[in-house]
């Protein structure tokens, strides 16, 4: 019997407001991948009223990173629920501990291909987020939370990107452009990788 091939995973990283969600939606539409947003999974869990939910709520509001094992468990459940698919994991791993937990718990189940990094200047992201905050109703689209999220990204998430860079597994996309120009690069990258 042939061994079932492991699903491919691409980590989608970039500062808050760099356009990760928008670009993931395009990849889903054109390549049939499943988009797993760590933040969305955590927000759903928070609303489910589980015991993890309350802790998650407090941490998100404070711009803190939820314990890795909680997020990895939610991601693994979502991957198990979508057999035979490839996955975009958006907004994770946010720090080295996240990444270590992912590698310990997931390396036998998935093939982590590369990090898709949307590189965008902070002032551009801030403008986008404040605009989104007018309509999104997200508790973290305000200037205080935004500053904390940039800090988390600059201090912690960049170390994850450096880690994957050592293995030549980071694809950088300049994201301070028209959304269609950005996607053009993404689409060409995915085609060149044989997806």
Swiss-Prot record:
Amino acids binding CMP: 98
Named cofactor requirement(s): Mg(2+)
NCBIfam families recorded: UMP_CMP_kin_fam
Cellular component annotations (GO), alphabetically ordered: cytoplasm; nucleus
Residue sites binding ATP per the record: 17-22, 132, 177
This protein's UniProt keywords: ATP-binding, Cytoplasm, Kinase, Nucleotide-binding, Nucleus, Pyrimidine biosynthesis, Transferase
Organism, scientific name: Dictyostelium discoideum
Chain sites annotated for binding a ribonucleoside 5'-phosphate: 43, 64-66, 91-94, 138, 149
GO molecular function: (d)CMP kinase activity; ATP binding; CMP kinase activity; dCMP kinase activity; magnesium ion binding; phosphotransferase activity, phosphate group as acceptor; UMP kinase activity
InterPro entries reported in the protein's UniProt record: Adenylat/UMP-CMP_kin, Adenylat_kinase_CS, P-loop_NTPase, UMP_CMP_kinase
Pfam families registered for this protein in UniProt: ADK (PF00406)
Domain comment in the entry: Consists of three domains, a large central CORE domain and two small peripheral domains, NMPbind and LID, which undergo movements during catalysis. The LID domain closes over the site of phosphoryl transfer upon ATP binding. Assembling and dissambling the active center during each catalytic cycle provides an effective means to prevent ATP hydrolysis.
Region (LID) residue spans: 131-141
Matches recorded under Gene3D superfamilies: P-loop containing nucleotide triphosphate hydrolases
Primary gene name: pyrK
Family: Belongs to the adenylate kinase family. UMP-CMP kinase subfamily.
Subunit and interaction comment: Monomer.
Catalytic reaction(s) noted: CMP + ATP = CDP + ADP; dCMP + ATP = dCDP + ADP; UMP + ATP = UDP + ADP
GO biological process, one term: nucleotide salvage
Region of interest: NMP: 37-66
Biological role stated in the UniProt entry: Catalyzes the phosphorylation of pyrimidine nucleoside monophosphates at the expense of ATP. Plays an important role in de novo pyrimidine nucleotide biosynthesis. Has preference for UMP and CMP as phosphate acceptors.
UniProt remark on cofactor binding: Binds 1 Mg(2+) ion per monomer. The Mg(2+) ion binds to water and substrates.
Protein name according to UniProt: UMP-CMP kinase
